[in-house]
A protein has these predicted regions:
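Conserved beta-loop-beta/alpha segment of the NTase-like Rossmann-fold superfamily
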Residues: 1-35, 68-69, 78-79
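Catalytic-core segments of class I nucleotidyltransferases/pyrophosphorylases
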Residues: 9, 38-114, 119-136
Length: 136
């Protein structure tokens, strides 16, 4: 996470988001970046049509659950309208921050990341890790 924090500091970012590439973005916040890692679009739990517009190569960049944020985010949270199920999503607040021309960057995680957002995904991640260990 040192590289994530270093990027955040060097770019004088308002927000820096850890990203991961996946094939199915339907359960996640999805982003698109430019060549300088500046985020140019963010959407929470996109429809298939919305997601297709953000596809890169053979996958999608999703928010991997870690965001570095400055205190200014609280002003944007107050302006964020509730979305699906009347929830206020931090992703929508960060999108407002970005639309206000604040520096929002993404850092793509290299390596393995396990989604544990559902019980089934948690069990699968645990099984994979258990298989890696030698308990003899």
């Amino acid at each position: 996470m040192y590289k994530l924090l270093k990027m955040h500091t060097e770019k004088k970012a308002e927000s820096t988001i850890l990203l991961n590439k996946v094939k199915d973005p339907s359960r996640f916040g999805l982003v698109k970046m430019d060549n300088n890692n500046q985020i140019i679009s963010i959407i929470e739990k996109p429809s298939i049509k919305q997601a297709e517009n953000l596809k890169i190569n053979s996958g999608f960049l999703i928010i991997a659950g870690l965001l570095i944020l400055k205190n200014s985010i609280f002003d944007f949270i107050k302006k964020t309208k509730p979305g699906l199920n009347k929830e206020t999503w931090l992703t929508d607040s960060v999108e407002l921050l970005r639309q206000d021309k604040k520096n929002v960057f993404g850092y793509e995680l290299k390596g393995t990341r396990y989604d544990i957002g559902t019980f089934e995904a948690l069990k699968e991640a645990d099984r994979i890790e258990q298989d890696k260990k030698d308990f003899s």
